[in-house]
Amino acid sequence: MNFSGKYQLQSQENFEPFMKAIGLPEDLIQKGKDIKGVSEIVHEGKKIKLTITYGPKVVRNEFTLGEECELETMTGEKVKAVVKLEGDNKMVTTFKGIKSVTELNGDTITNTMTLGDIVYKRVSKRI
């Protein structure tokens, strides 16, 4: 399945507790909690380009599925990780104790990030 497309955030669960747990400052948490971010994915073969726009903040990551890469996190930190494809509709990676699963079903992308007992879930629809 090809992940290419532009997706806008529709809903999210546990945004504030998760952002606090990863060390995002309170003022940025308050500014960011109501922003309907847009993710753009270009998926060509095993190569993925991901651009996430949250208001004025833009995070860009490029990686090859199954190979170690450097990813920029929501806090601006750079981390080494391997993004793997599970089945044909899930991308999975782990970094700094966070497991991230991005699943595509039709025109809906669900990203679930788990840190300890905090599960942050974002649901975005293709636009």
Swiss-Prot record:
Gene3D superfamilies: 2.40.128.20. The modification N6-acetyllysine is found at residue 84. It comes from the Eukaryota. The modification Phosphothreonine is found at residue 51. GO terms for cellular component: cytoplasm; cytosol; nucleoplasm; nucleus. Keywords: Acetylation, Cytoplasm, Lipid-binding, Phosphoprotein, Selenium, Transport. The modification Phosphoserine is found at residues 11, 39, 100. One of its GO terms (biological process) is cellular response to hypoxia. Its main location: cytoplasm. It holds the Pfam family Lipocalin_7. The modification N6-succinyllysine is found at residues 31, 36, 46, 57, 78, 84, 90, 121. It is found in: Cytoplasm. One of its GO terms (molecular function) is antioxidant activity. Belongs to the calycin superfamily. Fatty-acid binding protein (FABP) family. Forms a beta-barrel structure that accommodates hydrophobic ligands in its interior. Plays a role in lipoprotein-mediated cholesterol uptake in hepatocytes. Binds cholesterol. Binds free fatty acids and their coenzyme A derivatives, bilirubin, and some other small molecules in the cytoplasm. May be involved in intracellular lipid transport. This is Fatty acid-binding protein, liver. The lineage of its organism: Eukaryota, Metazoa, Chordata, Craniata, Vertebrata.
